[in-house]
Amino acid sequence: LTNRFVAYAGAVLLLQGLAGCSDEKKPGNETTGPVTAASEPVNGAAEIADRKLVVAFGDSLYAGYGVLPQESFPARLEKALAARGVAATVRNAGVSGDTTSAGLRRLAFTLDGLDRTPDLVMVNLGGNDMLRGIDPAETRANLTAICAELQRRGIPILLTGMVAAPNMGRDYAEPFNAIYADLAKRYDAALYPFFLDGVVTNRALMLPDGVHPNPQGIEAIVEKVTPIVAGALEP
């Protein structure tokens, strides 16, 4: 695993240097923003009711940092599901810079603002915690609270996990990397272990910052994640 993510370590070192002037939000002052549809609204109440509702709840990797809205992960996922015959609306609830703490604070607001209960909530948080060196125990506690709230509301979960870069050290990486599989088992959630798998180490699939995927990288991720989402939406 370490050999596969050597380039990831370099990207993390770069971003850690930028973290102090990034879009990190102060407690109580985070930008929640509206939950937006990944594509054009569907016409007709009956047609809307027949479609599955997926909420992509996460950070910049879901929000679509550095790409056009129609190139974002939620937008491309919706298109890919349609190509498989799965009628679904994928709502983009990604906020760039979000840590697990910020995500937890806005979770209820996000869910309560929806027209109906989602058929699936995808969660991708923790990358910014790792970049800022936040204690993995805190990250685990926040993600546990997020999963517990989704379970309390009867909403199925799909976790798209993150992996600590090798330069974070073994003492950090081991507890951090175990979080997503542990929570998937505890909350009977679907799991894609590493959102950037096969992408973050390929410069052709990444933006110049080396941290966020470009449109081609997003397509590569969507290709891998779509079958898992489709399976999670099956009755």
Description of each model-found segment:
Residues 1-57, 67-68, 82-86, 115-117, ...:
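N-terminal secretory targeting modules
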Residues 76-90:
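Signal peptide-proximal N-terminal region
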Residues 86, 104-235:
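Alpha-helical cap/lid subdomain in secreted, periplasmic
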